[in-house]
Amino acid sequence: MSEARTGGGAFHLTEELRDSPFMRACRREPAPHTPVWLMRQAGRYMKEYRDVRAKHSFLEMCKKPEVASEVTVYAAHRLNVDAAIIFADILLIVEPMGLELEFARGEGPAIHNPVRSAQDVDRVREVEDVSALDYVYEAVRITRRELRPGLPLIGFCGAPFTLASYICEGGGSKNYVHTKRLMYTDAGAWHALMSKTARALSRYLNAQVEAGAQAVQIFDSWVGALSPDDYREFVLPHTREVIRNVTPGVPVIHFGTGTAALLELMKEAGGDVIGLDWRVRLDEAWARLGDVAVQGNFDSVALFTNPEVVRARARQVLEQAAGRPGHIFNLGHGILPETPVENVVALVEAVHELSRRR
């Protein structure tokens, strides 16, 4: 793996898992076909997911390991993807940090005691012990038992910047006023918040690995709001800390959206795989990034078309990769709720068929 890692903990990797197309691609080794998995592959576009969701709140689904595992395994096997990703949410970690989290139906997540000042940063708890999230690790353990033996399981977390932005804004944002105000006016408080967040995330990821995840993804969904200079000064050291502290040997996927101006800096922060959105050509991004695996970058809105268009657009992405080892096919964003399931199935089938090495 590309990073000099200092993290500890067990890493569960059988020979069958090590040799899977997904794990081979993470190591930039040739695979029998281009591996494919999809962000939010367990989600509202599936009737079976909606049936489960009708019985539980979103947080209940995350906090009931059997339920989280059920939707994870069902989606992975139904779609025949090359990796599963545990059903959870990037914001679960904020509760042990002392922040009040709510998912109101139809309104998205809200943090009721946001951080806006140095005094607020002081009250954010240092998460030395991540056992409060044992429901996530139990979901990982159950899922690892229930998945096909050779199918890798991905754990994940939000990146320090995206998590800190939620913490400062108290929810979603278009302009990140509270986040950037703290960043620009009190750099000390900002770095203190990011450091606390990064340490918590490292421990959280390693606990998922110890429970049975074979790889991890770090979601920096909001980092495209930053200039390269701001990223380097206010974000890069903290994301690098998270990645360096992941258990050695575990592939790290470093994903962001709107990051065309930040790709080289993201690589500098670390990751064995850089996740790309649809706004940058895969071949051009890869030329800039050099010796690293890439993940992406099908536009999730194209899944609203039909199987023929889906197949044609999948071919375009694969042609940009040109069969080079180290490409993991994915979307540039999560699957949207109204997406026709048959188009998602068609995408996975097309990737497998079109990329099969003769």
Model-flagged regions — what are they?
Residues S2-R105, I142, L236, R240, ...:
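N-terminal basic, low-complexity leaders that serve as flexible interaction/assembly modules and, when applicable
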Residues S2-T6, T14-E15, D122, P149, ...:
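Iron-associated oxidoreductase/ferritin-like identity signal
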Residues A54-S57, A118-E128, M183-W190:
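Short glycine/proline- and acidic residue-enriched helix-loop micro-motifs
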Residues G106-E146:
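A gly/proline- and charged-residue-enriched helix-loop-helix capping module
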Residues A132-R358:
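Active-site loop segments of alpha/beta catalytic cores
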